[in-house]
């Protein structure tokens, strides 16, 4: 398939505002796709280069892309920067500069194919080591050298994961169902269990509903975690799960999925980052302590202070997880324990449709606990709010966040936030917000992004809604660190205002929530303060407007 056909589809999607019309267009396009590229096309339409389970990324930010565009179009860096500031989009910048280019005789005239683009993106993602930046640039420039202006717009946007077509995974799910006449629920389930929208599209096309039913969990193909809703107290949480539930300590660590295919063990974060190399102690302990060949287990990696027995600050754990060099040295400095709480797959058997009580039993059967290395999360099964409250207070005394209350009969629903699992924490809830923009500072803060625009998802997780700006309470050192982080995510610039690729999540606390027409959500956070950057969360994990409304109602009642 010619990439130009896909670029035309992207452009049409960009112009359409109706979700129903987008679904219809995508369905029609997928039906016309050759079988050998339908998986790639489905991923590309969903603004993905790789399946959700695949932790690879291209490693190309906006700074590097500006250099690529300059070289590929024979422009200067300043020409690219000025045009980008005017257009607010590097894709449009590349398109405009290619239209101006007069050296067409030097270009490779072969048309770009969708399969070639996918292969080149794979090569870019695999480049590492000395000279990696230059090699990534060369590969990306190779695509742009053969691209027509419109193709360049979308190649650049794809590489930056910023397609701007208003299409999300759920949109493509519906389109797959419509295109191939299969059940939407089967498509959703197959996607949940495979974390691979491309695979789902190909199976729907070639094997229909029968093939979709066969898609299941597989070790080394990590899935999105099941998510918890918040409850105000343990009494409310127990009531939500039917009066009796499993109460577990909510550890202050990083949620991980541990996979074994019988030959090797790998560890993934909730954002599907492969952190196996950084946690050799967990890998070794799991090999010794789990009596099964193939498995998928869930747990919390916790950095413990050996002197106090209490958890170290979360940022220290992140330092350990993100470390790429001198692993043995940092392993001694920051020892990590694995506390397991769920079992999703054992030796060929998927357990996602099994009640939680049975999954916990299987976990207890296969795990031999070893103090300080691999343990089961402490649990009590109770219908007594007083007993649950005692567990809650003990968790806080131990330095942890609170408790989880789980429905004993609940199956496991990947990527879904529901009331089958609830979290109870001691203070006014914080919000996990996607950072979508910022403002360059003035005076002493010139050269630093001084405030950040926060957003949450709408009910359908289709659009981001603004809820306020955070800037107070951050010293210059923090602002320097954040500015460095966000500079490469700038996708639009107008005066002092910038817009970011929605990738980073801030956890913020605040004094109050008020109704306000100032922001697109209709609400404004009063005196928000940054608690931490949630490196363990992706933008899709941020909170929704429903949580904002609930907190607003609770605040109203207190007033």
Curated annotation (Swiss-Prot):
Disulphide bonds in the chain? none
Which transformation does this protein catalyse, written as a reaction? ATP + (deoxyribonucleotide)n-3'-hydroxyl + 5'-phospho-(deoxyribonucleotide)m = (deoxyribonucleotide)n+m + AMP + diphosphate
Q: Please state the Enzyme Commission number of this protein.
A: 6.5.1.1
InterPro entries, per the entry: ATP-dep_DNA_ligase (IPR050191), DNA_ligae_ATP-dep_bac/arc (IPR022865), DNA_ligase_ATP-dep (IPR000977), DNA_ligase_ATP-dep_C (IPR012309), DNA_ligase_ATP-dep_cent (IPR012310), DNA_ligase_ATP-dep_CS (IPR016059), DNA_ligase_ATP-dep_N (IPR012308), DNA_ligase_N_sf (IPR036599)
Keywords (alphabetical) are: ATP-binding, Cell cycle, Cell division, DNA damage, DNA recombination, DNA repair, DNA replication, Ligase, Magnesium, Metal-binding, Nucleotide-binding
Query: Which domain of life does the UniProt lineage start with?
Result: Archaea
Active site (record annotation): 250
Q: Which GO terms describe its molecular function?
A: ATP binding; DNA binding; DNA ligase (ATP) activity; metal ion binding
Q: What function does this protein fulfil? A: DNA ligase that seals nicks in double-stranded DNA during DNA replication, DNA recombination and DNA repair.
Stored HAMAP family: DNA_ligase
**Family affiliation:** Belongs to the ATP-dependent DNA ligase family.
Tell me what this protein is called.
Answer: DNA ligase
The organism encoding this protein is Methanopyrus kandleri (strain AV19 / DSM 6324 / JCM 9639 / NBRC 100938)
């Amino acid at each position: 398939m010619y990439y130009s056909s896909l670029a035309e589809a992207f452009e049409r999607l960009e112009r359409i505002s109706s979700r129903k019309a987008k679904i219809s267009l995508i369905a029609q396009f997928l039906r016309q796709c050759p079988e050998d590229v339908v998986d790639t096309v489905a991923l590309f339409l969903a603004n993905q280069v790789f399946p959700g389970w695949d932790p690879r990324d291209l490693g190309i930010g906006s700074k590097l892309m500006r250099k690529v565009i300059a070289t590929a179009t024979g422009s200067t860096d300043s020409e690219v920067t000025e045009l980008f500031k005017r257009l607010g989009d590097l894709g449009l910048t590349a398109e405009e500069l290619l239209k101006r280019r007069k050296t067409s005789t030097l270009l490779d005239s072969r048309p770009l194919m969708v399969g070639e683009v996918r292969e080149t993106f794979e090569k870019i993602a695999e480049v590492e080591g000395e000279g990696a930046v230059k090699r990534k640039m060369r590969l990306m420039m190779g695509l742009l050298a053969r691209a027509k202006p419109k193709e360049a717009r979308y190649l650049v946007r794809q590489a930056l994961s910023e397609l701007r077509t208003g299409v999300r995974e759920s949109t493509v799910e519906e389109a797959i169902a419509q295109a191939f006449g299969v059940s939407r629920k089967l498509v959703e389930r197959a996607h949940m269990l495979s974390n691979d929208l491309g695979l789902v599209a190909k199976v729907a096309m070639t094997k229909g509903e029968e093939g979709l039913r066969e898609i299941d969990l597989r070790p080394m193909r990590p899935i999105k975690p099941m998510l918890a809703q918040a409850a105000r107290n343990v009494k409310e949480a127990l009531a939500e799960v039917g009066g009796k539930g499993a109460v577990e300590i909510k550890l202050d660590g990083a949620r991980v999925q541990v996979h074994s295919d019988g030959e090797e063990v790998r560890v993934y974060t909730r954002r599907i980052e492969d952190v196996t190399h950084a946690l050799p102690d967990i890998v070794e302990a799991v090999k010794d302590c789990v009596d099964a060949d193939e498995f998928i287990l869930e747990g919390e990696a916790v950095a413990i202070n050996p002197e106090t027995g209490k958890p170290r600050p979360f940022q220290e754990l992140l330092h350990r997880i993100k470390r790429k060099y001198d692993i043995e040295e940092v392993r001694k400095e920051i020892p990590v324990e694995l506390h397991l709480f769920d079992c999703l797959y054992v030796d060929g058997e998927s357990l996602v449709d099994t009640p939680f009580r049975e999954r916990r039993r299987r976990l207890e059967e296969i795990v031999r606990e070893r103090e300080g290395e691999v343990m089961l999360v402490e649990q009590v099964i109770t219908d007594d709010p007083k007993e649950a409250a005692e567990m809650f207070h003990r968790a806080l005394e131990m330095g942890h966040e609170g408790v989880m209350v789980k429905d004993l009969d609940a199956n496991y629903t990947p990527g879904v936030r529901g009331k089958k699992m609830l979290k109870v924490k001691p203070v006014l809830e914080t919000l996990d917000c996607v950072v979508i923009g910022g403002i360059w500072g003035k005076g002493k803060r010139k050269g630093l992004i001084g405030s950040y625009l926060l957003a949450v998802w709408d009910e359908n997780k289709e659009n981001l809604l603004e809820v306020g700006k955070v800037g107070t309470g951050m010293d210059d050192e923090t602002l320097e660190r954040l500015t460095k982080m966000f500079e490469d995510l700038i996708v639009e610039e107008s005066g002092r205002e910038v817009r970011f690729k929605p990738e980073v999540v801030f956890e913020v606390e605040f004094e109050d929530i008020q109704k306000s027409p100032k922001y697109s959500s209709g609400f404004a956070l009063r005196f928000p303060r940054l608690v931490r950057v949630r490196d363990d969360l992706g933008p899709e994990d941020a909170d929704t407007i429903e949580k904002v409304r609930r907190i607003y109602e609770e605040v109203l009642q207190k007033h």
